[in-house]
């Protein structure tokens, strides 16, 4: 048993006990020839990790020679006692500027002199004493010492300080700066997290500001570049009926600076509808539509098909029409950009132009407005929900002369379905739905919508050119 203990002691010392000074020449010869040196200076307090290292090294050694003979241990102690361990280079700390120079320790103060000497002695006597408990006890004992007891340690510390000053004349104490890694990391993670979470919110905010909030009169419609921005795959089916828009309200509120900047630079926000769920867009639009007053909305919706209120169209009604049409999953009516605007032409040429326009820009199904000789500058894509065309007639420029060649009513051909006129607002809450269904009166709207006398020139001349 004693031989096993000494084996662990000798093995432990080169592996690296905390204090290499315990291998000094004065302490090494105390190992007796019989291997049972009780007061051996090589004994340190082995922690559980160090014991594991020792056992692993024993297993890695020769399997048949479990115990080293006495002559081997004596040779090891003789070699270790003759070696000056101060010549071993210290590990270089990767500390910025001090990569080339080895780290120089501070000279020990009086307490460190006492603690090191007492730790060595106590570790010899009580090898299983835990290092932390040992440190606590040494600190308590040092505070209980009087001045006469502390004097030898103070003198030794002073001697060490003078020696240190001679050895390192240009020594300067440079404590390692404590890196605030966690705080900096937390600050660095915050913006990244915002952008990750705000990705979908930014898209929805671009959409919202494009259609409802940020309408400049000099800008064209964001959908006025002549090609529908919906992929045709999404335009086929009916829209996804949204649930109660609670979370979309918060996620849609991105910072207005971002929206204003993108609209100011680009002029037209580019929305990748391939990545946006139609259901989310419907939530967003319908949750923002609650800000519209019902009475304000009624002045944009002609209740009996009479277009007398067309002159009072504003930016809100314009944005509302395109937002409603997009929310239903279908392309809204698309007005041509200002550069393509043609002067008023004779009815045959206009008829040919309108036929080409309506059939080419409507890939989703059969065009609804194939008999429009009057759409000189306005092309309709196919609308599966035809009440949008009747609810929001597309007035974008005042120079269209509709009184010259106006047929009996292609625009209000669907206005007879006044009950379908308000089905767009079925996305609203049930508390708001009766406000719209009460207005629908299908009896007067049918005959009035087909009379050509309602298309009068002053309605369009009162509009200012955008």
From Swiss-Prot:
The gene is Sox10. Residues 62-102 are annotated as: Dimerization (DIM). Residues 160-173, 254-271 have a biased composition (Basic and acidic residues). Residues 228-310 are annotated as: Transactivation domain (TAM). SUPFAM superfamilies: HMG-box. Keywords: Activator, Cytoplasm, DNA-binding, Membrane, Mitochondrion, Mitochondrion outer membrane, Nucleus, Phosphoprotein, Transcription, Transcription regulation. Monomer. Interacts with Armcx3 at the mitochondrial outer membrane surface. Interacts with PAX3. Its main location: cytoplasm. Residues 104-172 bind DNA. This is Transcription factor SOX-10. Transcription factor that plays a central role in developing and mature glia. Specifically activates expression of myelin genes, during oligodendrocyte (OL) maturation, such as DUSP15 and MYRF, thereby playing a central role in oligodendrocyte maturation and CNS myelination. Once induced, MYRF cooperates with SOX10 to implement the myelination program. Transcriptional activator of MITF, acting synergistically with PAX3. Transcriptional activator of MBP, via binding to the gene promoter. PROSITE patterns: HMG_BOX_2. Residues 23-32 have a biased composition (Low complexity). Residues 1-67, 160-198, 213-275, 355-375, 433-466 are annotated as: Disordered. Residues 353-466 are annotated as: Transactivation domain (TAC). GO terms for molecular function: chromatin binding; DNA binding; DNA-binding transcription activator activity; DNA-binding transcription factor activity; DNA-binding transcription factor activity, RNA polymerase II-specific; DNA-binding transcription factor binding; identical protein binding; promoter-specific chromatin binding. One of its GO terms (biological process) is neuroblast proliferation. Residues 440-466 have a biased composition (Polar residues). It is found in: Cytoplasm; Nucleus; Mitochondrion outer membrane. It comes from Rattus norvegicus (Rat). One of its GO terms (cellular component) is nucleus. It is a peripheral membrane protein. InterPro entries: HMG_box_dom (IPR009071), HMG_box_dom_sf (IPR036910), Sox_N (IPR022151), SOX_TF (IPR050917).
């Amino acid at each position: 048993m004693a031989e096993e203990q000494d084996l662990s002691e000798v093995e432990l010392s080169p592996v690296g006990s905390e204090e290499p000074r315990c291998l000094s020449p004065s302490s090494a010869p105390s190992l007796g020839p019989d291997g049972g040196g009780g007061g051996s200076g090589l004994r340190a307090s082995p922690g559980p990790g160090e014991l594991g290292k020792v056992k692993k090294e024993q297993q890695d050694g020769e399997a048949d020679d479990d115990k080293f003979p006495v002559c081997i241990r004596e040779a090891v102690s003789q070699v270790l006692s003759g070696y000056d361990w101060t010549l071993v280079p210290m590990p270089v700390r990767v500390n910025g500027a001090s990569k080339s120079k080895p780290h120089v320790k501070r000279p020990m103060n009086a307490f460190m002199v006492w603690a090191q000497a007492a730790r060595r002695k106590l570790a010899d006597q009580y090898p299983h004493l835990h290092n932390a408990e040992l440190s606590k006890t040494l600190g308590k004992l040092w505070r209980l010492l009087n001045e006469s007891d502390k004097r030898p340690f103070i003198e030794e510390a002073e001697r060490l300080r003078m020696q240190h000053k001679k050895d390192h004349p240009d020594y300067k104490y440079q404590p390692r700066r404590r890196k605030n890694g966690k705080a900096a990391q937390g600050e660095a993670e915050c913006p990244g997290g915002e952008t990750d979470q705000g990705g979908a919110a930014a898209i929805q905010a671009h959409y919202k500001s494009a259609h409802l909030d940020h309408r400049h009169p000099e800008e064209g419609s964001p959908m006025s570049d002549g090609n529908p921005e919906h992929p045709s795959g999404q335009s086929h089916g009916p829209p996804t009926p949204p649930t109660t828009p609670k979370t979309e309200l918060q996620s849609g509120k991105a910072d207005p600076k971002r929206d204003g900047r993108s609209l100011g630079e680009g002029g037209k926000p580019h929305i990748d509808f391939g990545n946006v769920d139609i259901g989310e867009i419907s939530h967003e639009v319908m949750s923002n539509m609650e800000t519209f007053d019902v009475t304000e909305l009624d002045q944009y919706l002609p209740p009996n098909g009479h277009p007398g209120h067309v002159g009072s169209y504003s930016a809100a009604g314009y944005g509302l029409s395109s937002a409603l049409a997009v929310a239903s999953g279908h392309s809204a009516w698309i007005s041509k950009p200002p550069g393509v605007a043609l002067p008023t032409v004779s009815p045959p040429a206009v008829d040919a132009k309108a036929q080409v326009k309506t059939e080419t820009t409507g890939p989703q199904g059969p065009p609804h407005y194939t008999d429009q000789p009057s759409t000189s500058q306005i092309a309709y894509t196919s609308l599966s929900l035809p009440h949008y065309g009747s609810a929001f007639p597309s007035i974008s420029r005042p120079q269209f002369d509709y009184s010259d060649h106006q047929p009996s009513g292609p625009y209000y051909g669907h206005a007879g379905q006044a009950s379908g006129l308000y089905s767009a607002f079925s996305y609203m809450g049930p508390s708001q739905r009766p406000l719209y269904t009460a207005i629908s009166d299908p009896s007067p709207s049918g005959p009035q919508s087909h009379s050509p006398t309602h298309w009068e020139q002053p309605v369009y001349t009162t509009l200012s050119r955008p």
